[in-house]
Swiss-Prot record:
The UniProt record lists the keyword RNA-binding: no
Upper taxonomic lineage: Eukaryota, Viridiplantae, Streptophyta, Embryophyta, Tracheophyta
Protein's recorded name: Sodium/hydrogen exchanger 1
GO molecular function, one term: potassium:proton antiporter activity
NCBIfam families xrefs: b_cpa1
């Protein structure tokens, strides 16, 4: 009898829990729909964009739930860095690589790497050293050198979504490629830095530890990139050889999606950077795999990846806004509100300084290597690049949760203050800086200060070769590529020279093996039948 009562109670509890989950999911999906509708209606608004709209809706929903539960809870779901890194981040980063305009991205690759990798390292050291000097004297709690270095990595991760939503990549392709490319490389570098810090004993730092740390950092960077390229090439080879689309377009679309996700998860399994892996997987897939599938699959994959990325981004901002008011996080820091506000202000100031510490000096160095005036970064563009990296987003929150939480919510004052301070910086920078982005860009770039109303990327961007000619069309042939005549040309115009040898290598070896535009052998019923028939 007792067992039957216990089983009945357990069943009732399970049913109640199940019902609550279904209600939460329904409400969250409804909120996502509201974010999309309101974001569309406010598209022309001077101050608000879709990201800020989702954040505001999340905050308002959190307030309503907080009032309805009498201060016990403010969220439908608990923020989980696992949910963020495993399910939400992969489609966003993959689509960034898949839809990127490769002509501009690789044309400015050295500058992007300079800002995204070297610049992030400068920002990391600036914020870390300042945090050690300032916070160690403020009696925050039991924070050590490793925690302060982690703070540097956490607040070096930018979120340039607000700026990218305002910039038009057709009107300002150079600036857009710099902001976009730096944002992706920055996130990858910050996460690689953060993960590398967890593998070392940072209590006793000497030259050997620093060298080992740098070696581990470059190993993660290069290995992750190689894995992404390998996964993209493997998908291209399989689809090209099997001609899956001849029998089922669903299978080739599914294979592209699953192999892209597999590359990310495999990188995480091997303790590499999933962001770098899936980003370069997206670039390689758009260069080879996408041209090996049928025309209907090309349209499907292009819009499917863009839609998944858009939903994930909206989900993230809604998620962050709703979870920001979680009472369980704030109650441990509530007895020191002044100190929490002071730390948030200091961190915000360090973000501003750390960003300026590399944007303007590195822009100056980059301009020294450029001959053409249109390739140099003007001071107005430098201000936009600096501003674009001031916002902090879900990456910073996820890393902060990973570092400063224990068993869900921390009981330590120092850790609690760092969590709440991170949330404060993210909310303030996204809301305040984000609202000022449109007016600022309209002031600095009046000719291109109109909201982007087009699709995330035009079909043309998916046809562009991996490295295209500097002046020509994305679809041009290789006949107009000038062969470099001397070592001097290699030194003075390295991009053109690398482009020439890359195209020779790509045409001779890569495309015959992995496919790509115009280089897949004709076979009746194959994905290239239509393209050959139209010639």
């Amino acid at each position: 009898m007792g067992m039957e009562v216990a089983a009945a109670r357990l069943g009732a509890l399970y049913t109640t829990s199940d019902y609550a989950s279904v209600v939460s999911i329904n409400l969250f999906v409804a909120l996502l729909c509201a974010c999309i509708v309101l974001g569309h209606l406010l598209e022309e608004n001077r101050w608000v964009n879709e990201s800020i709209t989702a954040l505001i809706i999340g905050l308002c929903t959190g307030v309503v739930i907080l009032l309805m539960t009498k201060g016990k809870s403010s969220h439908l779901f608990v923020f989980s860095e696992d949910l963020f890194f495993i399910y939400l981040l992969p489609p966003i980063i993959f689509n960034a690589g898949f839809q990127v305009k490769k002509k501009q991205f690789f044309r400015n690759f050295m500058t992007i790497t300079l800002f995204g990798a070297v610049g992030t390292m400068i920002s990391f050291f600036t914020i870390s050293i300042a945090a050690i000097a300032i916070f160690s004297r403020m009696n925050i709690g039991t924070l050590d050198v490793g925690d302060f270095l982690a703070i540097g990595a956490i607040f070096s991760a930018t979120d340039s979504v607000c700026t990218l939503q305002v910039l038009n990549q057709d009107e300002t392709p150079f600036l857009y490629s710099l902001v976009f490319g730096e944002g992706v490389v920055n996130d990858a570098t910050s996460i690689v830095l953060f993960n590398a810090l967890q593998n070392f004993d940072l209590v006793h730092i000497d030259a050997a530890v620093v060298l080992k740390f740098l070696g581990n950092f470059f190993y993660l960077f290069l290995s992750s990139t190689f894995l992404g390229v390998f996964a993209g090439l493997l998908s291209a080879y399989i689809i090209k050889k099997l001609y899956i689309g001849r029998h089922s377009t669903d299978r080739e679309v599914a294979l592209m999606m699953l192999m892209a996700y597999l590359s990310y998860m495999l990188a995480e399994l091997l303790d590499l950077s999933g962001i770098l892996t899936v980003f370069f997987c997206g670039i390689v897939m758009s260069h080879y795999t996408w041209h090996n599938v049928t025309e209907s699959s090309r349209v499907t994959t292009k819009h499917a990846f863009a839609t998944l990325s858009f939903i994930a981004e909206t989900f993230l901002f809604l998620y962050v806004g709703m979870d920001a008011l979680d009472i369980e996080k704030w109650e441990f820091a509530s007895d020191r509100p002044g100190k929490s506000i002071g730390i948030s202000s200091i961190l915000l100031g360090l973000v501003l300084i750390g960003r300026a510490a590399f944007v303007f000096p590195l822009s100056f160095l980059s301009n020294l290597t450029k001959k053409a005036p249109n390739e140099k970064i003007t001071w107005r563009q430098q201000v936009v690049i600096w501003w674009a990296g001031l916002m902090r987003g879900a990456v910073s929150i996820a890393l902060a949760y990973n570092k400063f939480t224990r068993s869900g919510h921390t009981q330590l004052h120092g850790n609690a203050i760092m969590i709440t301070s991170t949330i404060t910086v993210v909310l303030f920078s996204t809301m305040v800086f984000g609202m000022m982005t449109k007016p600022l860009i309209r002031l600095l770039l009046p000719a291109s200060g109109h909201p982007v109303t087009s699709e995330p990327s035009s079909p043309k961007s998916l046809h562009s070769p991996l490295l295209t000619s500097m002046q020509g069309s994305d679809l041009e042939s290789t006949t107009n590529i000038v062969r470099p005549s001397s070592l001097r040309m290699l030194l003075t115009k390295p991009t053109h020279t690398v482009h020439y040898y890359w195209r020779k290598f790509d045409d001779a070896l890569m495309r015959p093996m992995f496919g790509g535009r115009g280089f897949v052998p004709f076979s009746p019923g194959s994905p290239t039948e239509q393209s050959h028939g139209g010639r």
